[in-house]
């Protein structure tokens, strides 16, 4: 039915988490249908299994027979786990698309079992001992323990609905499974509406998956594919009130008595502005900074006020041709190489050659090394005046000096 690549996980109650089975590694996990022997005068029987085989050594890492009553949990878009009795398995997928494909195939198999089209091995009383051994739902008992310390509480499946799978969505903050939309609507319909308001229609179809159970809320793909933020433009809200006499012929009947302040005559409308004369037209008003639209910078991904030329204020991540020219003319790369090879920490980090902030472990050795290097490379002494000229040019708005925010392409 489906074949994906994922890492098979097992529950570890000692640490309260999930551990990879057999030291980890990608496995090829598939949901397949296994056909059994054909009884005399009957149809061919079979069952569905989840089979996992590690790619590097072809070792079986997962073998689980599907039965009604399975509890399926979707923790996040790429990690799903399920439990069947005392057996608990989990899969870490490579992408949300593969996780959704596996979930749909698993729910389709459980729906087929619930309809009774296939008879599971647990309900047949005439199966041989060899078939019982081959259809054991939890052969990996050494890697799976009972989930007694689970932080997410679940409800037992009633006997009348044992054929339908239980699907829950968990979050990192510890909230329980979401309520299906069918139950929310049934509870809302039990109370009569207070006002005959029909401005907000209900959705035509509930969000439900295979098996008749689903969940609401915003999905993972909705956040990844969300559009750009709305422009921060100011708008004026104008509310107009109709006269009381206009409601006389309405179908709702005569209007109710209004208070005295509301029944007074409306104030006269302001006089209309005269048309512009033949004289010179006035200059257009300058747009205020609040009316400028907000855009996202392509370099630092921050929001900024977009101007007419599509650029904004200063951006530390934007390319600065003037500063790059100053570094090349003053040979600043020589000082950075000296600090990296001689005065860097265990992780290879070093401070800026011209930084004067306190806290350096060896300030005397640092400045002595830079002074000795300036004797061999005299152009290092030109960095301070060139840097000052670049700062003044950036303040004055000269072209090529100072990086600016640029709008990302839509």
Curated annotation (Swiss-Prot):
The modification Omega-N-methylarginine is found at residue 248. Residues 267-281 have a biased composition (Pro residues). SUPFAM superfamilies: PH domain-like. One of its GO terms (molecular function) is protein kinase binding. Phosphorylated on tyrosine. Palmitoylated by ZDHHC17/HIP14. It is a peripheral membrane protein. Signal peptide: none annotated. Residues 117-210, 258-288 are annotated as: Disordered. It comes from the Eukaryota. Keywords: Cell membrane, Lipoprotein, Membrane, Methylation, Palmitate, Phosphoprotein, Ubl conjugation. Residues 1-113 form the WH1 domain. Pfam families: Sprouty (PF05210), WH1 (PF00568). Residues 195-244 form the KBD domain. One of its GO terms (cellular component) is plasma membrane. Residues 120-130, 147-165 have a biased composition (Low complexity). Gene3D superfamilies: Pleckstrin-homology domain (PH domain)/Phosphotyrosine-binding domain (PTB). GO terms for biological process: negative regulation of epithelial to mesenchymal transition; negative regulation of ERK1 and ERK2 cascade; negative regulation of lens fiber cell differentiation; negative regulation of transforming growth factor beta receptor signaling pathway. The modification Asymmetric dimethylarginine is found at residue 240. It is found in: Cell membrane. Residues 296-407 form the SPR domain. SMART domains: WH1. PANTHER family: SPROUTY-RELATED, EVH1 DOMAIN-CONTAINING PROTEIN 3, SPROUTY-RELATED, EVH1 DOMAIN-CONTAINING PROTEIN FAMILY MEMBER. Interacts with palmitoyltransferase ZDHHC17/HIP14; the interaction leads to palmitoylation of SPRED3. Tyrosine kinase substrate that inhibits growth-factor-mediated activation of MAP kinase. Inhibits fibroblast growth factor (FGF)-induced retinal lens fiber differentiation, probably by inhibiting FGF-mediated phosphorylation of ERK1/2. Inhibits TGFB-induced epithelial-to-mesenchymal transition in lens epithelial cells. This is Sprouty-related, EVH1 domain-containing protein 3. It comes from Homo sapiens.
């Amino acid at each position: 039915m489906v074949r994906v690549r994922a890492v098979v996980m097992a529950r570890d109650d000692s640490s309260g988490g999930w551990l990879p089975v057999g030291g980890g590694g990608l496995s090829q996990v598939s949901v397949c249908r296994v056909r059994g022997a054909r009884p005399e005068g009957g149809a061919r029987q079979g069952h569905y299994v989840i089979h996992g085989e590690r790619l590097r050594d072809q070792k079986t890492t997962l073998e689980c027979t599907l039965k009604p009553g399975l509890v399926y949990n979707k923790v996040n878009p790429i990690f799903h786990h399920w439990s069947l009795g005392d057996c608990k398995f989990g899969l870490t997928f490579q992408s949300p698309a593969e996780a959704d494909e596996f979930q749909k195939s698993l729910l389709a198999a459980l729906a087929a079992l619930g309809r009774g089209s296939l008879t599971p091995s647990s309900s047949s009383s005439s199966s041989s001992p060899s078939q019982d051994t081959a259809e054991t739902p939890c052969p990996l008992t050494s890697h799976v323990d009972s989930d007694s310390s689970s932080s997410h509480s679940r409800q037992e499946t009633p006997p009348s609905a044992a054929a339908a799978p239980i699907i829950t969505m968990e979050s990192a903050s510890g909230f329980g499974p979401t309520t299906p939309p069918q139950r929310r609507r049934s509870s809302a319909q039990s109370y009569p509406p207070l006002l005959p308001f029909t401005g907000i229609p209900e959705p035509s179809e509930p969000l439900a998956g295979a098996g008749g159970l689903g969940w609401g809320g915003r999905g993972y793909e909705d956040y990844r594919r969300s559009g750009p933020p709305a422009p921060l433009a100011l708008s004026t809200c104008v509310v107009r009130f109709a006269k009381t006499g206009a409601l006389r012929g309405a179908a709702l009947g005569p209007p109710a008595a209004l208070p005295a302040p509301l029944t007074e005559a409306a104030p006269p409308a302001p006089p209309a502005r005269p048309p512009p004369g033949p004289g010179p037209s006035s200059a257009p008003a300058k747009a205020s900074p609040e009316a400028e639209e907000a855009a996202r910078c392509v370099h630092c991904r921050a929001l900024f006020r977009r101007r007419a030329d599509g650029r904004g204020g200063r951006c530390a991540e934007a390319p600065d041709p003037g500063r790059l020219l100053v570094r090349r003319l003053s040979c600043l790369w020589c000082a950075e190489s000296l600090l990296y090879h001689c005065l860097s920490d265990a992780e290879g980090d070093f401070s800026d050659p011209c930084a004067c902030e306190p806290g350096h472990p060896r300030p005397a050795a640092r400045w002595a090394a830079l002074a000795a290097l300036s004797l061999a490379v005299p152009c290092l002494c030109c960095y301070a005046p060139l840097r000052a000229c670049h700062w003044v040019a950036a303040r004055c708005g000269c072209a090529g000096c100072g990086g600016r925010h640029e709008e990302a392409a839509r």
